[in-house]
Amino acid sequence: MQDQIFFEDVIEGQEITSLEKKVTTVNILMYLSTVWLLDRIHFDYPFATQRRGLPNVVAPGNMAGDYYVELLNGWVGEKGDLRKLAIQFRSFMVPDEILVCGGKITKKYIDADKGYVELDLWIKNPDNINCVPGKAVVELPRKGRKEA
């Protein structure tokens, strides 16, 4: 677990610690079973490739959102909070890819004495394509202030 990061410790333009995720057929199936998503493009190879013309079975897009939540919650620590997350689905995530989830601080500001950080996010596949670009706002604790 990473040490707690504070608002005063970050600067605009800084990249956050990245997270690697390997997409596998097994973790796609486990994810599908938890969210009751039964679209065959996610688990039936012949259907996905022959009937739908896809390169492989594909991970559900909302899996990327969960990767971002894991990335950001790990970065902000116990005293930080994810306040807003927006993502766009641009390219498929397929089994056996190792994805790199990351982000870069684009803005930091104080509002109502709370420290907020805006980030541009990416999930890059092995071809360095940002499959699911995103944006987030997180709240980081401020040094010397008692947190609720």
Predicted regions: what they are:
Residues 1-15, 95-148:
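HotDog/MaoC-like acyl-thioester-processing domains
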Residues 21, 92, 110:
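Residues that form or immediately flank small-molecule/cofactor binding pockets and catalytic motifs
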Residues 23, 89, 138-140:
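Hydrophobic residues in beta-strands and at strand termini
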Residues 74-95:
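Mid-chain, well-packed structural core segment of small domains
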